[in-house]
Amino acid sequence: MNIEQEREKLILFTKIGAIVLTSFALLATSFFVYPENRAVFNESLLHEKELPIYCVEKDKPQISISFDAAWGNDDTASLLATLKKHKVKATFFMTGGWIEKYPDDVKAIAAAGHDLGNHSENHKQMSQLSAEQCKEELLKPHEKVKALTGKEMILFRPPYGDYNDNLIRVCREINYYPIQ
């Protein structure tokens, strides 16, 4: 190879390198200029794992208060009074057994304007159930609350925080938002 060919090869290599570096720089810059693009690249997409809702972006800082109603109702009346006193709304995630034992509390929670959430029929490890069993665990308390209050529940918090892809798909299939 003569010097002219070496020079042309070096110029070509430099041009290709400049194009590659510029492309990477533009891509990296887009993550800072358009931060909403970062949400597209999350672990669930890389691993194709279904995830429940952990947080929601809002214009101003807010928190969400929720209670699991599964074992007793000793504190329900005082909770409702405290929430009313401070003009705060909350979500009550109820199991089917709790709904059956305390129907007046379910009605009081609904009448006070709080969100009614589903916490399954029997408080089972949902990741151990088939799709059909998951659906049954969700639909039974749903129907009980609807019969008592006329309200449709759309939020589901899995017992023990236990979920898998199967459960999340079932939730979405029956128009529930899985919450963690």
Task: Give the positions of each predicted feature.
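Solvent-exposed loop/turn segments at secondary-structure junctions
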Residues: 70-73, 97-100, 116, 122-125, ...
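Acidic/histidine-rich helix-loop elements
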Residues: 35-38, 94-95, 126-131
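Short, basic/glycine-rich phosphate-binding loops at helix/coil junctions
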Residues: 31-34, 59-60, 115-120, 178-180
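Conserved, mostly hydrophobic/aromatic
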Residues: 68, 83, 92, 116-119, ...
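Loop/turn elements at helix/coil->beta-strand transitions in domains of secreted/extracellular proteins
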Residues: 61, 86-91, 111-115, 151-154, ...
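Catalytic domains of cell-wall/extracellular-matrix polysaccharide-remodeling enzymes
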Residues: 78, 124-180
